[in-house]
Structure formats: C-alpha cells, structure tokens
Amino acid sequence: MNDQRKGDHAEPTTHFGYQDVPESQKAKKVAEVFHSVAAKYDLMNDVLSGGMHRLWKRFTIELSGVRSGNRVLDIAGGTGDLAAKFSRLVGPTGQVVLADINDSMLKVGRDRLLDRGVAGNIEFVQADAEKLPFPDNHFDCVTIAFGLRNVTHKDAAIRSMLRVLKPGGRLLILEFSKPTNKLMSKAYDAYSFAFMPLAGKLITNDAESYRYLAESIRMHPDQETLKSMMVEAGFDRVTYHNMTSGIVAVHRGIKP
C-alpha cells in the first residue's frame, strides 16, 4: 500500500493494477472488473491457463486435508470449482460455505452448482474477506484461490481468516506468484501483457479487465513475502509449494 498523503486529511492510496487509487475506490473498481468477466470467467480460466488451473486447484485440495464432516470456507469462491470438490469430500455431515464479495460471481457460482446438483451442503454468502461474518473458531479449513491479490488490505484479510479457523485448522492460499526462472519470467511477462488483454477483447469484449488482472498479478506479494505475512498474522508451520516454475504458488498455514 502507498501511504503517501497529499495533505493532512488526504485518504491513503493503494494499488489497482499499476494505478494508485484511494483505498475506498479499490473495492468498487475490482467489483466492476468481476461484474464484467463473471459470465465467461470459467472459459477464460481454461483459455488463459491452458486448463492448468484445474491441476493447481486439485493440488490445493490435496494439501487441504479436508475430510468427511469438516466445515470449509472457500473465500472468493466465484464459480464454485473448489466448493464443488469440497462438497463431495465433506459429505452430508459436513458443510461448505462459498463466500464472494461480488454478487455477479456469486450468482454464477450458485447457478452453476445448482445445475450440477452439488449444492446440497453448500451455503452461499456475500462477504468481505477483510471482515468475515462468521464466528471465531468455526471452520476446519479456509481456502482462497486467485482472490487475495484483489483484496485491499491483505494483512487484515489473513487475520480475519485466522480468526474464523478452529485451532489446528488450515488456511490455503492459491495465487499467482513470482516465476523462479528468468527465462520463464520474461516469457510470462510477454504472455500476460500481450495475450491476456487480447484474449479478453476477443472472448469477452473487455481488454481492460484482463490488463488489470495481469497488472494485479505483478503487484501481489512474492512467495517469501506472503509467507512472512501469514507468520505475522499468527499462523504456524507456514509453507509454500511452487507450481509451473513459480507462476503459481500455494501457501499453507496452521492455526495454533
């Protein structure tokens, strides 16, 4: 966050992609992006990742340790990829809460899961990751996939996730990160800033939203920084696993 102020009473600013915007405006701008892309979000995920996002999510689920009877919170759950899989794992005695701050994404997720007949043990909640509306010590596992980079105050969100977890509960953060290979990093930059907006224009008629998404990835904390943020929030045994040469990483932490 950029804490520079133009005057004694100026509002703090934060980044929206590569832009500096007042903190109060970021959530609105992010909401506009996801209202725009919600209907074709799944299609664009497949196109832009070549289907790899499904493998990344599968590995995250394996790391979660979720089992029958667990209560799981999937933040920024969007169209319900993770929630559908957790629903099967927790079974009829468990519960999955799919939370998203964006009502358009939440509607797409609800409709998609209802159509697939997998929403029996899933609750849909519109919620802000920074101020989760759930009791303390409530969930066995909390996940957030490709959502943390869009949160204004990431540290506050991580603390909120810690609060709602039971002692011994697990947080998993799946997010784009910093490539570990210089050649891969250069290729990924070219891909992100040329192909992603072009694909957005051709498929959704919205290049700007995908330009923002590319920029937001670059502004997100790298692997070690995010690990430190989780430790500072109070998580124990924080580890991360790089996937696809660090383009994506999944972090896991345990509530003491």
Curated annotation (Swiss-Prot):
Which stretches does UniProt call biased (Basic and acidic residues)?
1-12
Which Gene Ontology terms cover its molecular function? Answer: 2-methoxy-6-polyprenyl-1,4-benzoquinol methyltransferase activity; demethylmenaquinone methyltransferase activity
Q: Where is this region: Disordered?
A: 1-23
Root EC class: transferase
Its GO biological process annotations read: aerobic respiration; menaquinone biosynthetic process; methylation
Q: Which reaction does it catalyse?
A: a 2-demethylmenaquinol + S-adenosyl-L-methionine = a menaquinol + S-adenosyl-L-homocysteine + H(+); a 2-methoxy-6-(all-trans-polyprenyl)benzene-1,4-diol + S-adenosyl-L-methionine = a 5-methoxy-2-methyl-3-(all-trans-polyprenyl)benzene-1,4-diol + S-adenosyl-L-homocysteine + H(+)
E.C. numbers = 2.1.1.163, 2.1.1.201
Pfam entry (one) = Ubie_methyltran
Question: Any keyword Methyltransferase?
Answer: yes
Pathway involvement of the protein, from the record: Quinol/quinone metabolism; menaquinone biosynthesis; menaquinol from 1,4-dihydroxy-2-naphthoate: step 2/2; Cofactor biosynthesis; ubiquinone biosynthesis
Q: Which SUPFAM superfamilies match?
A: S-adenosyl-L-methionine-dependent methyltransferases
Q: Identify the keywords attached in UniProt to this record, alphabetized.
A: Menaquinone biosynthesis, Methyltransferase, S-adenosyl-L-methionine, Transferase, Ubiquinone biosynthesis
Q: What does this protein do?
A: Methyltransferase required for the conversion of demethylmenaquinol (DMKH2) to menaquinol (MKH2) and the conversion of 2-polyprenyl-6-methoxy-1,4-benzoquinol (DDMQH2) to 2-polyprenyl-3-methyl-6-methoxy-1,4-benzoquinol (DMQH2).
What is the official name of this protein in its record?
Answer: Ubiquinone/menaquinone biosynthesis C-methyltransferase UbiE
Gene behind the chain: ubiE
